[in-house]
């Protein structure tokens, strides 16, 4: 029994060490070690990106051929970039795309405003209304997409704006926003299905989706 517990603790310690090394180095050989250790601990952790933005090439590949896609984002700029363009075309479209973005409407208990204040502490060009404006632009973009093709649902939420989740039926990209950096500069975890991290990412999304509000569509011009 003691040997079993020591083995489990050893695996967890090794996983933690490899995770730190992966964050420090971000090299592909290190990813293989992280993935091997994750199979022992059943976390499903496959890769660690130093910055969320450096994951976009792999994310684009995983989005191609996905049966469904779930996105929970703090701003949603990635939805308008090239990485997501295959989802908006009829040829490569998945069966279902669910998108959650923050509620940009004025309210006393706005978590979006809390994140704006947080970012403004390290980015002097980030005004209180800038994030709200950017979210509105991305909501408008996706709302128009929902009218142009089937299978896309858009909702808004007012919950702690502290992570981004992009998940498919095969994997999930999970970013925890730092209080001292933009999301694009925060580390991103790649979790394969099945696994503890993948399940946690889906639970995070589903909980937010259940308490979200359907976004009003913007009429096409």
Q: Residue ranges of each PLM-predicted region?
A:
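Signature of lipid phosphatidyltransferase scaffolds
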Residues: 174, 178-221
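HKD (HxKxxxxD) catalytic microenvironment of the phospholipase D
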Residues: 152-190
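Short flexible/disordered coil segments
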Residues: 134-139, 159-169, 212-221
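HKD-type phospholipase D/PLD-like phosphodiesterase module
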Residues: 112-162
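Hydrophobic, helix-forming membrane-interacting segments
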Residues: 1-33
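N- and C-terminal low-complexity/disordered segments
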Residues: 109, 119-126, 186, 217-221
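PLD-like (HKD) phosphodiesterase/transphosphatidyltransferase domain
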Residues: 26-117, 206-207, 211-214
């Amino acid at each position: 029994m003691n040997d079993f517990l020591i083995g489990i603790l050893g695996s967890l310690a090794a996983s933690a060490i490899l995770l730190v090394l992966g964050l420090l180095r971000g090299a592909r050989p290190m990813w293989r070690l992280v993935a091997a250790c994750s199979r022992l601990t059943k976390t499903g952790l496959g890769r660690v990106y130093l910055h969320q933005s450096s994951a976009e090439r792999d994310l684009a590949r995983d989005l191609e051929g996905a049966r469904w896609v779930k996105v929970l984002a703090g701003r949603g700029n990635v939805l308008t970039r090239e990485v997501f363009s295959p989802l908006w075309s009829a040829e490569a479209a998945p069966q279902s795309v669910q998108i959650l973005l923050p509620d940009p409407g004025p309210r006393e208990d706005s978590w979006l405003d809390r994140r704006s204040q947080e970012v403004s502490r390290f980015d002097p060009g980030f005004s209180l209304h800038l994030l709200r404006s950017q979210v509105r632009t991305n909501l408008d973009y996706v709302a128009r997409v929902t009218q142009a093709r089937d299978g896309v649902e858009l909702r808004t939420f007012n919950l702690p704006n502290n992570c981004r989740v992009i998940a498919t039926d095969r994997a999930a990209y999970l970013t925890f926003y730092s209080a001292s950096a933009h999301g694009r500069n925060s580390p991103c975890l790649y979790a394969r299905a099945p696994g503890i991290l993948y399940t946690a990412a889906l639970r995070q999304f589903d909980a937010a989706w259940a308490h979200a509000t359907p976004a009003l569509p913007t009429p096409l011009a």
